[in-house]
Amino acid sequence: MRLILLGAPGAGKGTQAQFICEKFAIPQISTGDMLRAAVKAGTEFGVAAKKIMDAGGLVSDDIIIGLVKDRLTQPDCSKGYLFDGFPRTIPQAQAMKDAGVPIDYVLEIDVPFDAIIDRMGGRRVHPASGRTYHIKYNPPKVEGKDDVTGDALIQRDDDKEETVRKRLQVYDDQTRPLVEYYSSWAAQANAADKVKAPAYRKVSGTGSVEDITTSIFAQLK
C-alpha cells in the first residue's frame, strides 16, 4: 500500500494517517522528519540540505526527491508507505513521477473550509498541561478556564481565524491543483510513464473519526 494523503490543514490527516499506517503496517513519511534524519546522519543529501537551511534558503525539490528515494530503500518500506504533506506542489509531484516513485493511491480527505475554520478557531489550550478544549464540541466546565487547575485557557496563534484562512489559501493555491494533476494523469496514462498512474480517491472528512476511517478503508482495496 503506497499512498499520498491530501487534505487541507485541519482536515484530520494526522489522525487518519495513524490508522492507515497501523492497518497496513507501513511507515508515515514526512519530509521534515527525513530532512532532520539526513542532516543528523550526515548523508550526501543531508549535508547539501544543511548548507541551504543554514543560509536561510528553501531546500530544492531535487534534494527532497533524493531523500525520498533513499528513504524508500529502508526495510520498513517493504510493504508500502504513506506520504503526508508531500508533494505539496505540481513541480514536486512531477519530480516524483519522473523519479519513478510508485504510488497506488492518492487519497484526499475533503472538509469544507468553513468547517475547518470552525474546528480550528474554536480550539482552546491549557499551556502548562497541553489539555485541549473546543468552545463548541468539547467546552470546559467554566468558560475560558481549565477543568483541572482553573487556569486561563489560550487560543494559539495557529488557531486564530486570520491565520487559518491564510493557511487554507496557500493550500488552495498550491496543493489543491494536485487533485487535477493526478486525475488527469490517470485519464491520460501512457506507456512512456516510468510508473503507473495512482488511483485518486476522495472521502468526506466530516463526521466521526470512526466513520471517516471506515470510509477510507473501504476506498483502499
From Swiss-Prot:
InterPro entries noted in UniProt: Adenyl_kin_sub (IPR006259), Adenylat/UMP-CMP_kin (IPR000850), Adenylat_kinase_CS (IPR033690), Adenylate_kinase_lid-dom (IPR007862), P-loop_NTPase (IPR027417)
Chain segments carrying region LID: 122-159
A single Gene Ontology CC term: cytoplasm
Pathway recorded for this protein: Purine metabolism; AMP biosynthesis via salvage pathway; AMP from ADP: step 1/1
Coiled coil: none
GO molecular function, one term: adenylate kinase activity
Enzymatic reactions: AMP + ATP = 2 ADP
UniProt record, GO biological process: AMP salvage
Pfam families: ADK (PF00406), ADK_lid (PF05191)
Enzyme class per UniProt: transferase
Record-listed ATP binding positions: 10-15, 123, 132-133, 207
Protein name as catalogued: Adenylate kinase
EC number: 2.7.4.3
Database matches in CDD domains: ADK (cd01428)
Subcellular location: Cytoplasm
Description of how the protein assembles with itself and partners: Monomer.
Note on domains (UniProt): Consists of three domains, a large central CORE domain and two small peripheral domains, NMPbind and LID, which undergo movements during catalysis. The LID domain closes over the site of phosphoryl transfer upon ATP binding. Assembling and dissambling the active center during each catalytic cycle provides an effective means to prevent ATP hydrolysis.
The UniProt record lists the keyword Ligase: no
Annotated family: Belongs to the adenylate kinase family.
Keywords attached to this entry: ATP-binding, Cytoplasm, Kinase, Nucleotide biosynthesis, Nucleotide-binding, Transferase
Record's function text: Catalyzes the reversible transfer of the terminal phosphate group between ATP and AMP. Plays an important role in cellular energy homeostasis and in adenine nucleotide metabolism.
Binding site for AMP: 31, 36, 57-59, 85-88, 92, 156, 167
Stretches the record annotates as NMP: 30-59
